[in-house]
Design a protein with these regions (language model features):
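Extracytoplasmic/secreted cell-surface and envelope-processing proteins
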Residues: 29, 57-60, 117-120, 179-181, ...
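Aromatic-lined glycan-binding groove of carbohydrate-active enzymes
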Residues: 234-266
Length: 266
């Protein structure tokens, strides 16, 4: 008897094979996230982006920002009371989750989504919300806004054993108003600031594609920056590649699943 012999080569076409889950609009239990990592590993997916904050649309809440649902899911000692009461993750379990995922060759990319999608933060600290563009927008003209967000990111980035364990951190940066040139320039400066903040802690910054929608003169760092290209109207892929960004293509109409939303071909 003889056994056939040979070489099997198994390798991916794409270095990042990812999935994003929105834990902001709806709480996702840690046990579910742990199971999801195991399933991803089985299918040789290697990146899970965990969207830690978001909010609903005010038109579904009597057009009242105060009534509109919003949540931030991670324990915060810097801002006691910020963390959602209807479901959250302790720092310890989030650290353990990231380390366990790494043993399955899955990198967790935590996302704190600012300066839009930020109602959880303005519910906590109303004075940093934008009266002009909506309370789900941080007011980019106030120094207090930067102080708040700086301290929040630093809580999870600093120290020898930081809460954000992996090599990448997502800073959000999508769907902010472009109604006026001055606010566009502020948005671009804000984006650049938080790219450099996370880089200062040795992390690679990941951003949502928004710089076509927010076209302006203020430079935004592109070297070694990953951009989630989700809609061409917000970030034209050809332009973004020319500008030096590394793109991950996630076209919303084809890959987003938003239950009962009605606007993603579901």
């Amino acid at each position: 008897h003889s056994f056939p012999k040979g070489i099997i080569r198994d390798y991916p076409d794409y270095s990042i094979r990812g999935f994003m889950i929105d834990c902001g609009r709806k709480f996702i239990p840690m046990s579910y996230l742990q199971d999801l990592v195991k399933i991803m590993a089985y299918y040789k997916m290697n990146t899970l982006q965990v969207h830690l904050n978001d909010n609903g649309f005010k038109q579904y809440f009597d057009n009242n920002w105060d009534k509109t649902y919003a949540a931030f899911r991670l324990e915060s000692e810097t801002y006691p009371g910020l963390t959602a009461r209807d479901g959250s993750y302790s720092k310890k379990e989030f650290i353990d989750f990231q380390k366990q995922a790494a043993t399955n060759f899955v990198e967790i990319i935590p996302e704190i989504d600012i300066p839009a999608h930020s109602l959880a933060f303005t519910h906590y600290k109303p004075e940093i919300g934008s009266k002009e563009y909506g309370m789900d927008h941080l007011d980019l003209f106030k120094p207090e806004t930067y102080q708040f967000a700086d301290d929040l990111f630093k809580e999870y980035l600093k120290g020898d054993d930081p809460v954000f364990v992996g090599k990448r951190v997502h800073i959000g940066t999508d769907e902010y108003s472009n109604a006026k040139k001055e606010v566009v320039e502020k948005f671009r400066a804000f984006t650049d600031h938080y790219i450099r903040l996370v880089e200062g802690f040795g992390k690679q910054a990941v951003i949502w594609g928004a710089l076509t929608h927010a076209k302006g003169d203020t430079p935004v760092k592109s070297e070694n920056i990953i951009m989630n290209a989700w809609y061409n109207g917000y970030a034209d892929p050809a332009t973004m590649i020319k500008d030096g960004y590394q793109l991950i293509s996630i076209p919303d109409a084809m890959v987003y699943i938003v239950p009962l939303a009605g606007y993603y071909q579901d």
